[in-house]
Amino acid sequence: MTNPHSIRTASESDLPALRTLVQAALVHDQDAADVLDLLWTQAASRPQLRLLAETDGQPVGLVVGALGPATADAPATGHIDLIAVHPQAQSRGIGRTLLTRAEELVTAAGATRLMMRGRPPYYAWPGIDIRYTRAVCLAESSGYTRGREGLNMGVDLRTAPLDTAADEARLAAAGVHVRRLTAQDEKPFLAWMTRWGGTWDGEAARALTYDPPRGHVAVREGADGVEYVGFACHGVNRRSWFGPMGTDSALRGMGVGTVLLRRCLADQLAAGLDEAEIGWTGPVHFYARGVEARLGRVFWTYSKDI
């Protein structure tokens, strides 16, 4: 026989034990405790979506959910941001019980679609890391349909080419200057960031909350003064992750993006990191060429209509 488990809403006082739990469960994420803190904060508006499973008074499982409001492009969506079950308590139905209860709560709140996918601007993963095989099996046996794949690339910061002096001098001669973001950039930079669409402006805003800001920009003189033409951020959601980044289409091919990328990775190396992850990677060849990045983690996204 297995010991019965009970489900209740998790509270702030549970956090120390929950950090220990996720560190044991998320074996492919060394910063699991930080991941929990990030997702816990994002669920603050609906704390009832933080559910804890206990056996004999000890935490053995956790789910953190969220509700995304309906938009012109998507229905109200329930998000399953995290499911973790202690290794010693797996295969007892705890994960399924937590998932079912979270689904019931977001459905009662109005969700007509469920997703297991990164929820920008503040997210921990693009989807389920396929190495968490039990999580993949749980999603697929619970009626979720696999969607797009997300890829991360890894960079060995100890050996990657991170020097930018010569390229910065070349760009400066062409009128493009690369520098770190500053607090004084906040208003004009975030106004410029809205042109990119999506949620990159939210991620960039978070980069500005750190001291020093975790981002770099490329600027040049325009008709109305200094204008931004490129940006890159790091450590926005997870300390070891890089992104987002973008360069004005008119300047692509000049090496602006490579300089911005290398500057951010140099920051991470200076902060004591040996490895960096490029999250939700798009142009694989660009990163492989620029910093010798290599393909690493694979994530599957899942959705289910209610």
Residue ranges and their predicted role:
Residues 85, 91-104, 108, 247, ...:
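Conserved acetyl-CoA-binding loop-helix of GNAT-fold acetyltransferases
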Residues 253, 260-306:
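Short hairpin/turn module used for nucleic-acid contact or packing/dimerization
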